[in-house]
Amino acid sequence: MDLRLEVRALVEYIALPGIAAVLPWRWSMAVFRRLARWQWLYQPEWPGALATAKRYLAIDDEAAFARDFRLTRLIDHADLYLTWFRSRRRYLARHVEVRGTWPAAGQVLVGVFFHVGPGFWGVHSLRLAGHSSAVLAGHYSRRSMGDAYLGWYYGVARLKTLQWASGRPLIFSPGTLAKAQQELDAQHGVIGTPDVPPEITRYSQPVQLLHRPAQLPAGLIEIARRGNAQVVIYDTQVDLATGRRVLSIGAPLDPNDQALLAHVAERFETLLREQPSAFSLWSFADSYFRV
């Protein structure tokens, strides 16, 4: 065990974002904005994100990108503690602006979101709208969490909380398609992200992304087609001045539309251009373009 790595994990995953559990959100954001100036925070994550983002986008203010990346990570990690210690219904009403509406409860859907901005509040909103959904997830490893045992424990806690928030067991590979079909057959939803590395799935397909030939996983669309479930694309962005989230819910889409993955890629690109520092998977972005 490397004590320095454990201390870093304690600070980055628990102590600092945990401030949101004890302070009002307005005060927490004021603290987070000051902490985000600290270049030591979320190293080497933010330098790697900046280096990769610069290969695909024009980053005019690198210092601002780095600061906003750190701030977004603080907010995303804080959402775990807000989920534990705040009423999600009251918090959504006060701090999350919802644009659009979910399909009526009882209508089976496949939800598509991205690792751009915090992910918990879309899941909370969907659950409160009457939809229980199984989330496609991946296991955390100690290596993926900074080689720290505390980081790994945090990741496990986050997955367990996500399962509680969504209302259904998480879906891990192998057997993703079969498990997802069982959920849809039982009138539950399935939600996941199409921006994970394409090489981890057999269902990647070509798209245009950032004006380049690319590929994105199409497993969620395949799940929707097999289950004849409508597809809803949604995302959560953050006003970094106030910490207020904006949850945008798209209109239901036909899973058999041949242009559906292109539509997903278009929304993904829009988010990357609007708030590139909010994307937490820049370290994997090169894999989209290995076509």
Question: Model-predicted segments: where are they?
Answer:
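Short catalytic/ligand-binding loop motif for oxyanion handling, primarily in non-cytosolic enzymes
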Residues: 82, 86, 119-121, 143-145, ...
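Short, contiguous strand/loop micro-motifs
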Residues: 37, 109-110, 166-167, 206-209, ...
